[in-house]
């Protein structure tokens, strides 16, 4: 009560933030007449003046009012568009490393030019990050004229650019690109062998457009660069033939129940589990096929690979649907992004899932891949000195932005009041009833000329609705993963009178729907339009615009509630831009995924009590509340998954930073002989300690073993026994020093033969090659450790702590192996001349180019990877852990002490 009263008196934190910034807006507005009177040349000269003032120690904050006034004036002259005050506020929020929540149509693209110009004055470069290639190219081309007018360069960063073109793009003052491409460039740069092969420079300031999509929706999916592993396509094909013989069982096995089915499905966590009956049946099938010995079991260590293939194939058949999770095009399985409905060519699911789906669809099975480098968006974007973002929907995720990225969300006021009518949800018993009601509503709105945008959750649903509308004779456009090449055109015309547009899962995001259609689109289609043509197009558009407003503006129809309220708000946000009229409504059924999994019992009972008849809908605040609660549950679970991913990836990230810093040091150094000398001393002394323990009696020494080891590992033939026999005063410490000195002497002789320069180049090449090989193997070891670490809960140990401890041990082992491998190679190799080093370098370059051609860039399905760990990864409760000899029932409390049922905890390991 008191907090509400205080908020009313002094305003919320958001209000106070905006109030402080409005003073600076007033300052910028006062400068407008002065800047308006400047000649073009004087306005352009401001950039040089600002840079000189920065060099003299003036801060960006002091420059901000004048810099923003400069951009606003330049925009008026170049585009004929003046930044609104709310856009100036948005620009300040972005410069302050905060997230600006700006409604659709408020001009986020133009807002970003303000902080981009200000921060680009430093010469360090600004990255404006978008969700797809089309938006990156569009925004770069749209704003290029403005930045170039002010003497700044603009670049674009999209896939498949030649390295030199990428390097030039990164040297631009302002660079537009996609989140994936920035992340992959970072990983590729840290796989390069020469400084000149890298494209990125320092990561200074990033403005992330649609920040919720990139930093929240895609945060669960790490970016992975992988190379081809061994061919196992035949195994996928053979196992794929077995899966259709398995029968689904609806109820989990327990002490009181053992079903006849072979597997159960957990839709919430997207997991499948073999039942006891299923395990026996699969073992029988594998034995018949000669793929497993008769007396063997599926869970024996020798059959881990078979279990991996069975699990992947079962998930592919049961949980991944064609035209929902992926499409098949040109004999390829292409993933559909669950958040945007866009296809993701070149991206592949990991852990054999993609190959299992290829086997299921009968297309060519590509080799499994081995991880070469990976990073999450969370850890990539935290590398920037300054990070900010903008979106139409951030407030529901404000806590996550603050806790994970340290970014405060500021909700921006609209330039004009929002008048959209958001109507209550209508809930039907069946999907058929729901779609019949949607068709009827569209028919009525179509008849009066009101444009309708229909949001669906999958390609399958969009095509189902499309077929129903065709039967009714209603002309419409379908925008989904299959046809997103014409996305911008369809969206540009979605506001025309009577237009009906079906869009899968917010495809087309980033393009405004203008009532009456886009007059800019019409003008761009003309070659050299005259002033008269442009004027006529604007007059015609004005008439169409008023007609659509009179019909009620754009109506949004949601065919299903998304797991996240934010995605629903994004769909609604397409209507009511810039104070336009509009309306929205969601239609739901008890057969929808969200309702079936999370809200079914409560709402279904409510509907039965009300005596619902076929075709009748329920509209009640209780139902809306139940649905919101279901969405909150999913949002909470997804937040936990993202947080879990980050906690595990933070461990790997610390190691990644060490390795990448070492690579940088190696690449930039002309001479690493000091590092090699230190490593050689450490490695040889460690070997000597193994055979001559420190402060030990001579009787405990294994001199013969030491001589053999030095010969085998370092090609050092030393008569150590002879030294000891002939020199009475050759004690342990003196002996250690002599062995190291002899190793140095032999290496110096090698340097005299081949020359210092040749050997320095060779040392660097060997060090880099071995570091990359061992890092790749270390990533694989970390993956294996991660997949099984949740089992430590059985032993009353905290899996996260165990993961940290063991991954550190693995990392130390990797660094020790790097030292010993490099010293061994350099000691044993015979380098004759510079040509040999050049040949070796050329071979390495060719191998790297071949690997680059075969590299896969993918988003790992991290949700499935973590689903097991999210429950088991909690700190174990204290107390004695007693394991019973009998098998734990799936509905019994899990032995790990989490308090959850076994099937919801460690029973998920299948």
UniProtKB/Swiss-Prot annotation:
Keywords: ATP-binding, Cell inner membrane, Cell membrane, Cytoplasm, Membrane, Metal-binding, Nucleotide-binding, Protein transport, Translocase, Translocation, Transport, Zinc. It is an enzyme of class 7 (translocase). Part of the Sec protein translocase complex. Interacts with the SecYEG preprotein conducting channel. Has a central role in coupling the hydrolysis of ATP to the transfer of proteins into and across the cell membrane, serving both as a receptor for the preprotein-SecB complex and as an ATP-driven molecular motor driving the stepwise translocation of polypeptide chains across the membrane. The keyword Membrane applies. Residues 561-584, 835-910 are annotated as: Disordered. SMART domains: SecA_DEAD, SecA_PP_bind. Its cofactor is Zn(2+). InterPro entries: Helicase_ATP-bd, Helicase_C-like, P-loop_NTPase, SEC_C_motif, SecA, SecA_CS, SecA_DEAD, SecA_motor_DEAD. One of its GO terms (biological process) is protein import. Residues 561-571, 841-853, 880-890 have a biased composition (Basic and acidic residues). PROSITE patterns: SECA, SECA_MOTOR_DEAD. SUPFAM superfamilies: Helical scaffold and wing domains of SecA (SSF81886), P-loop containing nucleoside triphosphate hydrolases (SSF52540), Pre-protein crosslinking domain of SecA (SSF81767). It catalyses: ATP + H2O + cellular proteinSide 1 = ADP + phosphate + cellular proteinSide 2. Its EC number is 7.4.2.8. The keyword Chaperone does not apply. It comes from Photobacterium profundum (strain SS9). This is Protein translocase subunit SecA. Monomer and homodimer. Part of the essential Sec protein translocation apparatus which comprises SecA, SecYEG and auxiliary proteins SecDF-YajC and YidC. Zn(2+) binds at residues 894, 896, 905-906. Residues 900-910 have a biased composition (Basic residues). GO terms for cellular component: cell envelope Sec protein transport complex; cytosol; plasma membrane. HAMAP family: SecA.
């Amino acid at each position: 009560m008191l907090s509400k009263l205080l908020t009313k008196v002094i305003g919320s934190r958001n209000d106070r933030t905006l109030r402080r910034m409005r003073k600076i807006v007033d300052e910028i507005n006062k400068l407008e007449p002065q800047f308006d009177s400047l000649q073009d040349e004087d306005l352009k000269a401001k950039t040089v003046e600002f840079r000189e003032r920065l060099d003299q120690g003036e801060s960006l904050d002091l420059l901000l009012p004048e810099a923003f006034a400069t951009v606003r004036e330049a925009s008026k002259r170049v585009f004929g568009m003046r930044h609104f005050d709310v856009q100036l506020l948005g620009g300040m929020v972005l410069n302050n490393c905060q997230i600006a929540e700006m409604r659709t149509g408020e001009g986020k693209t133009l807002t970003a030019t303000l902080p981009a110009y200000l921060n680009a004055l430093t010469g360090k470069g600004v990255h404006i990050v978008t969700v797809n290639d089309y938006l990156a190219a569009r925004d770069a081309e749209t704003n290029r004229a403005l930045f170039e007018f002010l003497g700044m360069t603009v670049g674009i960063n999209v896939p498949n650019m030649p390295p030199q073109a990428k390097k030039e793009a990164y040297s631009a003052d302002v660079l537009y690109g996609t989140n994936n491409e920035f992340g992959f460039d970072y990983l590729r740069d840290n796989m390069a062998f020469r400084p000149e092969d890298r494209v990125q420079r320092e990561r200074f300031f990033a403005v992330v457009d649609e920040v919720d999509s990139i930093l929240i929706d895609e945060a669960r999916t790490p970016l992975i660069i992988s190379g081809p592993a061994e061919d196992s396509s035949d195994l996928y094909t053979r196992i794929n033939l077995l899966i259709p013989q398995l029968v689904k069982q609806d109820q989990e096995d327990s002490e009181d129940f053992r079903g006849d089915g072979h597997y159960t499905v957990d839709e919430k966590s997207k997991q499948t589990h073999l039942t006891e009956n299923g395990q026996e049946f699969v073992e029988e099938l594998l034995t018949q096929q000669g793929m497993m010995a008769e007396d063997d079991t599926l869970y024996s260590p020798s059959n881990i690979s078979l279990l991996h293939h069975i699990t992947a194939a079962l998930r592919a058949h049961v949980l991944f649907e064609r035209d929902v999770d992926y499409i098949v095009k040109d004999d390829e399985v292409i993933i559909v992004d669950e958040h945007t409905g866009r296809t993701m060519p070149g991206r592949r699911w990991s852990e054999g899932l993609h190959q299992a789906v290829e086997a299921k669809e009968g297309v060519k099975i590509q080799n499994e891949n081995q991880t070469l480098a990976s990073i999450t968006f969370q850890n990539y974007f935290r590398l920037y000195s300054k990070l900010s973002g903008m979106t139409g929907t951030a407030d529901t995720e404000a806590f996550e932005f603050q806790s994970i990225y340290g970014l405060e969300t500021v909700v921006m006021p609209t330039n004009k009041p929002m008048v959209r009518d958001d109507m209550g949800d209508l809930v039907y018993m069946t999907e058929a009833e729901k779609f019949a009601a949607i068709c009827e509503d569209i028919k009525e709105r179509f008849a009066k000329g009101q444009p309708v945008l229909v949001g669906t959750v999958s390609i399958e649903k969009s095509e189902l609705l499309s077929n129903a509308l065709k039967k009714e004779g209603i002309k419409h456009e379908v925008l989904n993963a299959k046809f997103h090449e014409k996305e911008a055109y369809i969206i540009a015309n979605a506001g025309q009178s009577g237009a009906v547009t079906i869009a899968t899962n917010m495809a087309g995001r980033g393009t405004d729907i203008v009532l009456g259609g886009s007059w800019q689109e019409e003008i761009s289609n003309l070659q050299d339009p005259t002033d008269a043509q442009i004027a006529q197009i604007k007059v015609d558009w004005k008439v169409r615009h008023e007609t659509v407003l009179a019909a009620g503006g754009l109506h949004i129809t949601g065919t299903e509630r998304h797991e996240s309220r934010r995605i629903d708000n994004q769909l609604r946000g397409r209507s009511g831009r810039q104070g336009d009229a509009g309306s929205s409504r969601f239609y739901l059924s008890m057969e929808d995924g969200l309702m079936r999994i999370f809200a079914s019992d409560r709402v279904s009972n409510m509907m039965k009590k009300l005596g619902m008849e076929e075709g009748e809908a329920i509209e009640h605040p209780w139902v809306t509340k139940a649905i919101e609660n279901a969405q909150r549950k999913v949002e909470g679970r997804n937040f936990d998954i993202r947080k879990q991913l980050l906690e595990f990836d933070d461990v790997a990230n610390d190691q990644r930073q060490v390795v990448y810093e070492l690579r940088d040091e190696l690449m930039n150094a002309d001479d690493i002989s000091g590092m090699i000398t230190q490593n050689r001393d450490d490695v040889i002394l460690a070997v000597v300690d193994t055979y001559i323990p420190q402060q030990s009696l001579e009787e405990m020494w294994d001199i013969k073993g030491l001589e053999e080891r030095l010969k085998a590992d370092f090609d050092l033939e030393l008569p150590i026994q002879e030294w000891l026999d002939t020199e009475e005063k050759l004690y342990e410490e003196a002996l250690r020093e002599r062995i190291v000195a002899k190793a140095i002497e032999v290496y110096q002789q090698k340097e005299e033969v081949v020359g210092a320069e040749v050997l320095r180049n060779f040392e660097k090449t060997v060090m880099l090659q071995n570091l990359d090989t061992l890092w790749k193997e270390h990533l694989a070891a970390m993956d294996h450790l991660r997949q099984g670490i949740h089992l430590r809960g059985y032993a009353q140990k905290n899996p996260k702590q165990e993961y940290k401890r063991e991954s550190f041990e693995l990392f130390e082992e990797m660094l020790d192996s790097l030292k010993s491998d490099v010293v061994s190679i350099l000691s044993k190799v015979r380098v004759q001349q510079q040509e040999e080093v050049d040949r070796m370098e050329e071979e390495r370059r060719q191998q790297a180019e071949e690997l680059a051609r075969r590299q896969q860039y993918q988003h790992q399905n991290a949700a499935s990877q973590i689903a097991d760990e999210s429950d088991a990864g909690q700190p174990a409760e204290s107390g004695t852990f007693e394991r019973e000899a009998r098998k734990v029932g799936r509905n019994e409390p899990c032995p790990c002490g989490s308090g959850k049922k076994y099937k919801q905890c460690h029973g998920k390991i299948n």
